[in-house]
Design a protein with these regions (language model features):
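A glycine-anchored, Pro-Gly-centered beta-turn/N-cap motif
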Residues: 76-80, 202
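N-terminal edge beta-strand
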Residues: 1-10, 117-144
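Solvent-exposed, low-complexity, repeat-rich "mucin-like" stalks and linkers
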Residues: 24-28, 131-157
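Beta-sandwich strand segments
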Residues: 92-97, 215-221
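Short, solvent-exposed loop/linker segments at beta-strand-coil boundaries, enriched for Pro/Gly
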Residues: 152-154, 159-180
Length: 230
């Protein structure tokens, strides 16, 4: 079992999970399939249990967990475990939910762990629902911004606020993932993914706009938020 911990988040937050193969591959080079995901609280009670049928290749899988109950109310402060079941065993992440004011007192963190070239990455997740939000991360935390859109229309999301001394470093180029659909069908929407890592203390603002890059018109959508790294 590969375990990451402890990832600290404020009440009501969302996390994203990826299993990434490091190259060049030295072992476990065959495809790895995700078969399920579960969320368990500190007393061992299962809050969420999701099975994938059919199973999903880790190359295409992106797990999302919202730390809210069935009524969309934030889960209580405390320790939780996210377990990801795969064809080669279990990956897990220990998560501590705290009040927002406690985030600044938490220490540095490494938001990944690996075995035999397979790395589990944990991200604080933001979407268009977080427009106007202000959140706190620790140095070493990862952030994923996932924005719905449709690349087949020519529209794309882009962060228009570029700073000289960034406290969050973009770790990969923007990725677009279309929703699963039959190969012969076109025009399906999907999600634009942006990945960052908190590398220094300070604050940084983000302004994502959804538009066609060649058009000189107002963006169709705007999502803004700020991040403080403690």
């Amino acid at each position: 079992m590969v375990s990451v911990g402890t990832f600290v988040i404020e009440k009501g937050a969302r996390l994203a999970f990826e299993i990434v193969r490091q190259e060049p591959c030295t072992c476990l080079c065959d495809p790895v399939w995700v078969t399920g995901l579960s969320l368990v609280d500190g007393s061992g009670e299962t809050i969420r249990d999701e099975a994938y049928d059919p199973s999903v290749d880790t190359v295409e899988w992106l797990g999302r967990v919202a730390f809210v109950d069935d009524a969309e109310e934030p889960l209580s402060e405390g320790l939780y475990t996210v377990s990801i079941q795969t064809s080669i065993g279990e990956f897990s992440a220990c998560v501590e939910v705290v009040a927002s004011q406690r985030m600044a007192r938490m220490g540095r963190f490494s938001a990944s762990a690996s075995v035999c070239g397979l790395e589990l990455r944990v991200y604080r997740l933001l979407t268009d629902e977080d427009d106007g939000a202000s959140l706190t991360l620790r140095q070493g935390d990862r952030l994923m911004v996932a924005l719905a859109g449709n690349a087949t229309t020519g529209f794309e999301w882009a962060n228009t606020l570029l700073v000289e001394y960034a406290v969050l470093r973009e770790t990969e180029q923007m990725e677009y993932r279309a929703k699963p659909h039959p190969a012969e069908m076109v025009g399906f929407g999907g999600t634009f993914l942006f990945r960052y890592e908190a590398i220094a203390q300070g604050s940084q603002a983000f302004r994502f706009v959804y538009r066609r890059p060649w058009e000189s018109v107002q963006p169709k959508e705007i999502v803004e938020f700020s991040v403080h790294v403690s």
